[in-house]
Amino acid sequence: MQICKKNVFLLYYGVLVFLSFQVSSSTDTISTNQPLSGFETIVSSGDIFELGLFTPTPDTYDHRNYYIGMWYRHVSPQTIVWVANRESPLGGDASTYLLKILDGNLILHDNISATRKSHTEGTSRRSPQKISEGNLLFHETVWSTGVNSSMSKDVQAVLFDSGNLVLRDGPNSSAAVLWQSFDHPSDTWLPGGKIRLGSQLFTSWESLIDPSPGRYSLEFDPKLHSLVTVWNRSKSYWSSGPLYDWLQSFKGFPELQGTKLSFTLNMDESYITFSVDPQSRYRLVMGVSGQFMLQVWHVDLQSWRVILSQPDNRCDVYNSCGSFGICNENREPPPCRCVPGFKREFSQGSDDSNDYSGGCKRETYLHCYKRNDEFLPIENMKLATDPTTASVLTSGTFRTCASRCVADCSCQAYANDGNKCLVWTKDAFNLQQLDANKGHTFFLRLASSNISTANNRKTEHSKGKSIVLPLVLASLVATAACFVGLYCCISSRIRRKKKQRDEKHSRELLEGGLIDDAGENMCYLNLHDIMVATNSFSRKKKLGEGGFGPVYKGKLPNGMEVAIKRLSKKSSQGLTEFKNEVVLIIKLQHKNLVRLLGYCVEGDEKLLIYEYMSNKSLDGLLFDSLKSRELDWETRMKIVNGTTRGLQYLHEYSRLRIIHRDLKASNILLDDEMNPKISDFGTARIFGCKQIDDSTQRIVGTFGYMSPEYALGGVISEKSDIYSFGVLLLEIISGKKATRFVHNDQKHSLIAYEWESWCETKGVSIIDEPMCCSYSLEEAMRCIHIALLCVQDHPKDRPMISQIVYMLSNDNTLPIPKQPTFSNVLNGDQQLDYVFSINEATQTELEAR
């Protein structure tokens, strides 16, 4: 009987919980008797918008701030469209927060216990309210709608499907509107929202994780009857022009053809609004980058797509690089850098390497009174004639302009613009770098220590030593003559022994079973034939420079065109790597692997003869602004699929399981039909059939392409190549080079840049512009998704190459990638080759045998 009663009680309790959940999850109203507490939310009647407590940093456990905000209910990741308490974030325990109707206002309260109060600062807005269970509670108003009190007891706050939160004087739809969120926007303009001309503005977030008001805003200029974007409430840098003409221009966008997006300008009631098809989702956002963007939600792709951004050039955003910062749109992100002699000054609380809002400050202070300052010319600059920072002298030649600045210690810089002389007596803002032979020369005042005076010192030094030099030379001639003969004898003997040793190694190579005459059309060429084929390694025959030496184009006596790789004497690749590359390519035969035709080991020279690839390496096309236009979407996918097939052969289907270890764009060669072929096997490793991973003392490869476990711990596996392939795939889709991100300047790596873009727009913004409209957006998004799966930190999280081949050829659902660790890289394609000990145990590298 007791068990039966217990079951009935549990059933009754469960029904009550279910019914209460249904009520709380379906309500769209906050009333006097129905406040919102903790993480409770209200949802618009059409299940479109949701309002409640959120945090922009859900992954942070310490110092987490909370805000009352509104977001799309079925959009992921969470997209915030309105924030109530932008300037008053909530901290501490979220369960103490209460959003309720009080005295005709919607008010956000923070009920703080006496214990918690003792650890908080400032009590000016808190007062004892009541004693509950022995704890004294303090009551704080964090945010309020701030309207005149209403005598009605039926005041309600209702969330509508338009995204408008309305405070009205009663439950009926005809009740008077006391306040609405559309009149107090944050950074987002939603369909149906009205911009009251001359009073309302949209202000960007301070950063992607900080909703507080930022530096940029969208306002209405009543004098020009146009929308303008403004920096720091003081400097406008973009204008729509006459509003009517600007609104009409939207009809010309191909992405908007067939939609019902329309703008309405009502000058009588002084507002502007826009409407869309109820089934679609559009929004206009004032972004943290200072760009005003029109975005549409793609249901199939589950991402926001930017249709329009104004201004479309990041460098047109006023002061995007701060004081004495130079903006260059053609530069790899970030587009900002400091002028010479200056260093970046971080904004308070910011450690973002892309953030130049704090501007740049001098490395060495000026000492004008000592006449120790000089002027450094910076060419091809677009100058901003801001009247607050630059004085315009309407007359005077270039020499006059320079002399005026030199004589004035407050002059920071000058420039001559035709007949005008520009003089900066304060900080210089909005400097832009243009293409060669464009713009003007900007003369920057620097301390002498920041400008090289090596030539002057060299001249003075040469004068001082002109008397001593003949005496020194005379005393050294006799000694030098004695040493020359001795040196020639010793060096000749060393060269002779080295040649004998190398020829012995060469014979070992030929006789040791690595290469046999039954090989795949392999042949040995003597050095003389190769010299003839390359015209003595002429510059005109040079195709490029690889990690281990230059590559030349040659023509054999039988008329065949070949590519000849000449191992550099300074290269870290020795005879071991040379043997490795020869044996691997001989034993590996696949249409997506480069074919080795011959070799030469003679004296100091080690050469490999490959089949000639008319389109050279992928990096020569991909990272060239003009040549990249040849790589349309179909061609890029052909390269991606061919590379995966070649890599799958190495990992799974070849006689030897091979880990390449240096997969990158410069090691992907393209034939005349753009078929990719993987090359450069000098650093490859042979794995046993059942071997999963290996360790090495010697880390070889290229910064930016190496997996974390390999670069930091020397652990090699198939997943090391998968990581490199992920970076290569990101490069192919974005057209950006992984090794352009400099570690010393603390710039983001390519992976960090791609990850942030993927989080914001599912990666749409990173797709290479030269592809124009040739690409399939869905395929591009899928490739970016696959690439991010490949560059995950842990090898076990990365897919196998066979899984990648399947992902690229199917449209099955992909797993969600984990955020990778953002690593920085060295400047340029720098080969890494160093030795370290793992757990103090000596490891040796396997050689091909």
Swiss-Prot record:
Domain PAN positions: 368-447
Cytoplasmic side, ranges: 488-849
UniProt subcellular location: Cell membrane
Keywords: ATP-binding, Cell membrane, Disulfide bond, EGF-like domain, Glycoprotein, Kinase, Lectin, Membrane, Nucleotide-binding, Phosphoprotein, Receptor, Serine/threonine-protein kinase, Signal, Transferase, Transmembrane, Transmembrane helix
Region described as CaM-binding: spans on this chain: 626-643
Residues where Phosphothreonine is found: T696, T844
UniProt modified residues of type Phosphoserine: S571, S666, S679, S837
Catalyzed reactions: L-seryl-[protein] + ATP = O-phospho-L-seryl-[protein] + ADP + H(+); L-threonyl-[protein] + ATP = O-phospho-L-threonyl-[protein] + ADP + H(+)
Glycosylation positions in this chain: N111, N148, N172, N232, N450
Domain Bulb-type lectin: 27-180
Pfam families per record: B_lectin, PAN_2, Pkinase, S_locus_glycop
Domain of life: Eukaryota
Membrane topology: Single-pass type I membrane protein
Extracellular face residues: 27-466
Annotated binding of ATP, by residue: L543, G544, E545, G546, G547, F548, G549, P550, V551, K565
Keyword Cell membrane recorded: yes
The enzyme's E.C. designation: 2.7.11.1
Domain EGF-like: 311-348
Homology family: Belongs to the protein kinase superfamily. Ser/Thr protein kinase family.
Protein known as: G-type lectin S-receptor-like serine/threonine-protein kinase At4g11900
